[in-house]
C-alpha cells in the first residue's frame, strides 16, 4: 500500500495521503506536524553530525531582510547527505539560490524536505525514486549563493497539508526541533 501510494505520488502528483500511514498527524495542523516529526526519530541529514552540533538558524535574517527558512549544517565538502525519512524524490535539479538541490516528500506527501548547496548528487539519484531513511542522496557543497562561503547543507522542511504531494515553500517548518530534544529539568 505505502509503496504503491508513493509511486502514484511521484508519477501523478497530488493524491490523498495513504490511509495506512502511521504519520497522518503530519497532515493536520503545522503544530501537529511538528510534534509528530519531533517524535519520529528523523535521521540528521548530514552523516556523522550529532544533535548537539546543530544550530537553530531558522528565521535568521538574510540578504534584503528575507528570513532563513531552514537550518544550515556546516561540514566539509563531500560529506554524505542522507534522506531524513522514507519518501520519494520529487526534484533533482539546480537553481540560482540553492545551487544543486534535492526535494523529497515524506511518505504522507504532507511534508517536503529541501536539501540545497550540494556539491554533487548520489550516483543514480533521480526524480521519482523511492528512498528510505538514511539513503544517500548527495554530498555537502557550496553551490548556488553559498559559493565562496563555508560549505554546508541548507536543510528546509515545509508543511504541504493543504496540497499533499505538491512541493511548495509557503509554510516553512523549523527543522531544528525535529532533531534536538529539549532538556527537561
List the predicted regions and their residue ranges.
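Zn2+-dependent peptidoglycan hydrolase active-site motif and core
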Residues: 84-127, 150-154
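Solvent-exposed loop/turn segments at secondary-structure junctions
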Residues: 60-61, 80, 94-97, 108-111, ...
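Sec-dependent N-terminal signal peptides
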Residues: 1-14
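Core beta-strand residues in small-molecule sensory/regulatory alpha/beta domains
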Residues: 74, 82, 124, 130, ...
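Conserved, short, structured surface segments that act as functional micro-motifs
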Residues: 103, 129-185
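Generic beta-structure capping elements
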Residues: 57, 76, 107, 118, ...
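Surface-exposed, glycine-biased beta-strand/turn segments
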Residues: 13-100, 133, 142, 172-185
